[in-house]
Every structure is written in C-alpha cells, then in structure tokens.
C-alpha cells in the first residue's frame, strides 16, 4: 500500500532537511485495508511517500501494489502505477477519493480500480475472486464493524 506524495494539499505537510512537518491523515484508509489483508494472512507493508523514501526496489517482488489517491496526488499515483507495470510483475490496484470520482481515468493506469469504501471488497479483489476492472464497493452498513487502522504495517 502506497500513499503517493502530492505536489499540493490544502494544509500540506512538508519535508525539510529530511524531516516531515505537519500532519498527514491521508493514510488511515490504506492502514484499515492493509489490516484486513494482514488479518487474512497476507504480508502487508504500507508506505507514505511524504514521510520518507519508499524502497521501490524492495517492492519489485510484491504480488499486488495498492495506490491510494487524492486528487492532488493522482498524477504521482499514475506515475507510480506505470513504474510498477514496467518494472515488476505486480498487479496494481488504485483506490481513494480521486479514483472513486474518476474511475475510468484511474483504470487507464491500474489493473483494477476500487470505487467507494474498499473494506468489504479488498480481500476478494486481492485474492482474485473479484476480477472486474472497476469494482464498485458498497457503502458500509455498520460503521462500527470497520476495523481500526493497523499502524504496525506502516514502514515510513
């Protein structure tokens, strides 16, 4: 799971001299989805580009790469998707607010796009039971059943 750095955010966190400043809250969704995958027995690592360097060479062996997009980070997410397609065998999944608003755009870069809240479909998508190019996830019926983010998978 990678949350790409964006060129612009409304109240942007930033890096200066190797240290991150400000608050980033865009990683919560990926940490929830990663926690679901981890609980099901998958090896999961999450990275937020803004908080440090992502070891892309290390990720060359990944089977699946999930990219989370805000509108401000979509160009970077698409750049990363192209890199993973060119340099790895990984399937690339794209989700997040921007992908939910413009799924056809995201589908040009991803093997699959998750539209909406992915908690109910992420496991089936990753394990190949859902193969649609654009996956429309249903709205959660009971918010109390959504797990807490698993910060243990965050590597940066």
Named regions from a protein language model:
Residues 1-156:
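Acidic, low-complexity intrinsically disordered segments
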């Amino acid at each position: 799971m990678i949350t790409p750095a964006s060129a612009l955010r409304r109240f942007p966190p930033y890096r200066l001299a190797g240290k991150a400043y400000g608050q980033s809250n865009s990683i919560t969704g990926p940490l929830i989805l990663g926690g679901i995958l981890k609980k099901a027995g998958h090896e999961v690592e999450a990275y937020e580009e803004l908080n440090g360097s992502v070891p892309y060479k290390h990720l060359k062996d990944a089977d699946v790469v999930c990219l989370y997009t805000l509108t401000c980070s979509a160009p970077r997410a698409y750049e990363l998707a192209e890199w993973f397609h060119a340099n790895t065998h990984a399937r690339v999944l794209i989700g997040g607010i921007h992908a939910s608003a413009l799924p056809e755009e995201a589908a040009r870069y991803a093997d699959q796009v998750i539209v909406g809240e992915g908690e109910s479909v992420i496991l089936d998508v990753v394990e190949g039971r859902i193969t649609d190019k654009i996956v429309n996830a249903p709205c959660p019926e009971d918010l109390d059943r959504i797990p807490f983010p698993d910060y243990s998978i965050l590597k940066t």
